[in-house]
């Protein structure tokens, strides 16, 4: 069974169109192992796989046998006004156990609302107001989630485009307060830091330096769409730009090497082109191979809380 420490090195988001490409290269004896050797783990959204049967179930089983898997949720709505979806979390718990998946993460956002007494999904990830009240509310829901799952989760810093007018805290202060109050781990999204820094005019490096590095379990890096000079959209559809690569490099300098996953959700190129960015992450990590444990918190590339 995979354990948290197996999530290490470089990962790739597992999209349906990539499955046959990875399987073909993995099974082709005439293809050098180095073609996909730098894919050390994969990530899936549990919502897309819970209850899957037939070929989808067989594909998942194939990856479970060959790769450590991280689950990155989409619809828990940690900041939502409706009650936490306990039935869904029970499904997640069973899914994690059945597929030997050691890690579950979610977005620090909300994607549900209540109208006329009925809860419904908004199909987008929206920012939580950055207030002390929201810190306590979200942290309680994270603790409840951890209790129901019987394990720690990690929350991801999200991109957003409109800040709530009632916010009274900076994003980094809100994030750190939630992490402390909930005592959970951090799923660090490097591209989201950069996107928000451009959209809201703060220094991405200063934000990064205030991250509690000992809570990082793994990170995302991705491309984004530039709409205009002051507006970036986190589309996961483009190649990663140099300032985002530089921010990842800076994060490794600050915190040591942590597992990092390439996100590509739309306009997905053939696997060999994706491997160019996967291999670049590996190259950057190799520059800091002797800096895996600056504070003694890393274990096999994954930090754990004492």
Language-model-detected regions and their locations in the chain:
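Active-site acidic/histidine proton-transfer and metal-coordination neighborhood
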Residues: 85-185
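Acidic/histidine-rich catalytic cores of soluble enzymes
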Residues: 146-231
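Acidic (Asp/Glu)-rich catalytic clusters
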Residues: 23-37, 53-71, 87-102, 146-148, ...
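C-terminal helical cap(s) of enzyme catalytic domains, especially alpha/beta-barrels
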Residues: 270-291
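Boundary/entry segment of secreted carbohydrate-active catalytic domains
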Residues: 2-26
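Acidic-and-aromatic substrate-binding clefts and catalytic sites of carbohydrate-active enzymes
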Residues: 17-20, 45-56, 77-87, 161-169, ...
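Hydrophobic faces of well-ordered beta-strands that scaffold small-molecule active sites
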Residues: 8-14, 40-44, 69-72, 104-106, ...
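Gly/Pro-rich active-site loop or hairpin
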Residues: 51-53, 83, 125, 129-132, ...
């Amino acid at each position: 069974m995979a354990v948290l420490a197996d999530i290490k090195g470089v990962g790739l988001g597992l999209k349906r169109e990539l499955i046959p490409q990875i399987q073909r290269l993995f099974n082709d004896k005439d293809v050098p192992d180095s073609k996909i050797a730098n894919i050390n783990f994969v990530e899936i959204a549990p919502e897309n796989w819970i209850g899957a049967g037939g070929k989808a179930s067989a594909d998942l089983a194939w990856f479970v046998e060959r790769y450590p898997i991280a689950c990155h949720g989409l619809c828990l709505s940690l900041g939502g006004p409706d009650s936490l979806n306990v039935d869904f979390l029970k499904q997640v718990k069973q899914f994690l156990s059945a597929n030997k998946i050691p890690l579950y993460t979610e977005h620090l956002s909300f994607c549900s609302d209540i109208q006329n007494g009925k809860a419904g999904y908004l199909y987008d990830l929206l920012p939580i107001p950055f207030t002390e009240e929201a810190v306590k509310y979200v942290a309680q829901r994270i603790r409840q989630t951890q209790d129901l799952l019987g394990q720690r989760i990690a929350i991801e810093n999200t991109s957003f485009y409109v800040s709530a007018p009632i916010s009274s805290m900076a994003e980094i202060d809100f994030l750190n307060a939630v992490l402390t109050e909930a005592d959970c781990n951090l799923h660090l999204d490097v591209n989201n830091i950069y996107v928000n820094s451009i959209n809201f005019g703060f220094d991405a490096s200063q934000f990064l330096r205030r991250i509690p590095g000992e809570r990082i379990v793994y990170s995302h890096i991705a491309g984004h769409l530039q709409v205009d000079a002051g507006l970036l959209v986190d589309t996961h559809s483009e190649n990663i730009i140099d300032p985002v690569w530089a921010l990842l490099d800076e994060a490794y300098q600050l915190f040591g090497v942590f597992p990092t996953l390439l996100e590509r959700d739309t306009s997905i190129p053939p696997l060999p082109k994706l491997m160019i960015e996967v291999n670049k992450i590996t190259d950057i990590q190799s520059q800091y191979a002797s800096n895996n444990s600056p504070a003694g918190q890393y274990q096999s590339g994954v930090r754990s809380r004492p």
